């Protein structure tokens, strides 16, 4: 039974540190305690534990734009975070978890602005069928968290830009994100800002549980442990190195012919590449494909390797430009 409420508000927008703090709070929560942790990430795509990042978002474009890719501990789908989004986490022991009660905190907080929200589908929270909060869960060795998003004034253009993968036929054993209609709460009530929603969440937390909440000070955290966690979440091995093999087919028709490039990828490395075309210039196509094998699945590296190989085969400049652009746009 919950008998102690604690709140903690992040002081950073670094997504790797925020996830490290979340993990730390979860594994240090006391029996009977529930911690409400509020945090924000700047320009970030967060994917589920078992997802294929290349399938869920435009990784190269996101990182070229200064964004961050983050893999969380919980399952579920990919989400976009910016400073128009407020994230929450309920940390507690597994035996104290009550999803309905936890979601009621969200519903109560939104209700304080005169909006009627309800739980829908797979633990989403929506208003008139439009989702503003997606939720996911994690538990390990009796420790548990329930976290989610609150869309306040998120840049939905960026959300669509980075979450929608290219039209290439990407096949994977990873978990697909479920695309839903979403709504920014500020569009329904101008009084909703990040600050007002934080206060509403803290007030609703105490109201729903019927207990006063005490804030947790940063000096009570083990900053060395959190830094180690941050390094792990930020590592390439954690972000990209999940063993989820997939095939990406790049295909495009040009004035000089149609091109298909099948890239078989495992642990961010190309294991096989098959390049084919109906072009009259097709003699060198099979050689080009083999030179991709063993390379990291990164746009910049593949473009350099492709351009170098095309030059060696004396491929006309217009065809070189078309093929390099295809790789840049579809990976």
Residue ranges: model-predicted function:
Residues 40-43, 119-129:
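Short, glycine/charge-rich beta-strand/loop segments that flank catalytic centers
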